[in-house]
C-alpha cells in the first residue's frame, strides 16, 4: 500500500514537470530556451511518471518494462536533445524564432 502512494506521488511530480515544461515551451522567447523546456518534459517528466506507474502496477513484469523504458528515456533523450542543439548551432540558426521559420520554408 505504501508503494502505491509513492507511485501516486511520483506521477504527480512527473506531471508537474511536464506542465511546467509546457508552460516554458510556450513562454520562452527563442529556439534554444524552448529546446531546454522540451528536454525537461522528455528527460524528467515522462520517466518520473513511468517510474510512478511502475510502482502502481500490480504485475512485476509490467513494472520491469516500465522501469526499463524510463531508463532508456533517461539515457537516450539528453543525447538526442544535444544532437539537435548542436546541429542547429552547426547550421548557424540564431536564437530568433523568425529565422527558423524562414529556413524551414526555403
From Swiss-Prot:
Pfam families: PhaG_MnhG_YufB (PF03334)
GO molecular function, one term: sodium:proton antiporter activity
Coiled coil ranges: none
Similarity comment text for this entry: Belongs to the UPF0091 family.
Protein name in the entry: UPF0091 protein RC0354
UniProt organism field: Rickettsia conorii (strain ATCC VR-613 / Malish 7)
Lineage of source species: Bacteria, Pseudomonadati, Pseudomonadota, Alphaproteobacteria, Rickettsiales
Amino acid at each position: 500500500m505504501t508503494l502505491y502512494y509513492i507511485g501516486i506521488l511520483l506521477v504527480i511530480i512527473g506531471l508537474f514537470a511536464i506542465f511546467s515544461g509546457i508552460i516554458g515551451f510556450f513562454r520562452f522567447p527563442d529556439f534554444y530556451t524552448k529546446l531546454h523546456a522540451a528536454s525537461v518534459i522528455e528527460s524528467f517528466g515522462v520517466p518520473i511518471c513511468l517510474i510512478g506507474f511502475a510502482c502502481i502496477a500490480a504485475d512485476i513484469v509490467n513494472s520491469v518494462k516500465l522501469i526499463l523504458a524510463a531508463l532508456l528515456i533517461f539515457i537516450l533523450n539528453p543525447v538526442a536533445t544535444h544532437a539537435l542543439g548542436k546541429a542547429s548551432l552547426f547550421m548557424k540558426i540564431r536564437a530568433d524564432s523568425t529565422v527558423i521559420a524562414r529556413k524551414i520554408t526555403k
